[in-house]
Curated annotation (Swiss-Prot):
Topology versus the membrane: Single-pass membrane protein
A Pfam match: RNF152_C
Broad class of the protein's primary localization: membrane
Protein name: E3 ubiquitin-protein ligase rnf152-A
Lineage: Eukaryota, Metazoa, Chordata, Craniata, Vertebrata
């Protein structure tokens, strides 16, 4: 088989979608790999599974489904499909002296798979390479691998956010009180001005 790039190894060569728990990499008898969704569509249209490239037939016994075909071990080794729900958080690990973890948004269409390498923009348009790592919920460290000073800094930052919210609310209330006070002074002065021009009768 010809040498494939890392990206083409991670995607089905029929639909060009990345392999995922829903689109598992299935191995045909001719040793080519397609995603389970494409193979299910092919199976619905024809009795036997024919490889789109070499036309080799992969026979499935009666009552067997595409999901019972073996996964391609080479592809599975690269993508390491996790047994987790789509709500499992995904983190990136920055290669540096310390270990920093940042939550990433996960979309269904273009979700990053474990082992994907990307980059994160830093101030000054510098790029830092990152590697994506997924962790099942029960294995996620609370603060085990993160240095204590970073944990404290994060707690302080969250405390600042809470205190800045309260200080904003207090500021609004204080400004409202000052405006009511000033309005009272203005109204009082206006009532005094109108009394100045009235005739005072002497008794």
């Amino acid at each position: 088989m010809e040498t494939l790039s890392q990206d083409s190894l991670l995607e089905c060569q029929i639909c060009f979608n990345y392999y995922s728990p829903r689109r598992r990499p299935k191995l045909l008898d001719c040793k080519r790999t397609c995603c389970s969704v494409c193979l299910q569509q092919m199976r619905a249209c024809q009795k036997d599974l024919r490889c789109p490239w070499c036309r080799g037939v992969t026979k499935l016994p009666p009552g067997y489904s595409v999901s019972q075909l073996p996964d391609d071990p080479d592809v599975v080794a690269v993508i390491t499909i996790p047994h987790a729900s789509e709500n499992t958080p995904v983190f990136i690990k920055l290669p540096s002296n310390g270990c920093y973890m940042w939550p990433l948004p996960v979309s269904k269409e273009r979700a990053l798979l474990p082992g994907d390498i990307g980059c994160r923009l830093l101030p000054g348009n510098q790029q830092k390479p990152v590697t994506v790592v997924t962790m099942p919920m029960e294995q996620q460290p609370l603060h085990g691998n993160i240095p204590q000073d970073i944990v404290e800094e994060e707690h302080e930052r969250r405390g600042v956010v809470k205190s800045s919210t309260w200080s904003g609310i207090c500021t609004v209330i204080l400004v409202a009180c000052v405006l009511v006070f000033l309005l009272g002074i203005v109204l009082h002065n206006m009532s005094c001005i109108s009394k100045r021009f009235t005739v005072i009768s002497c008794g």
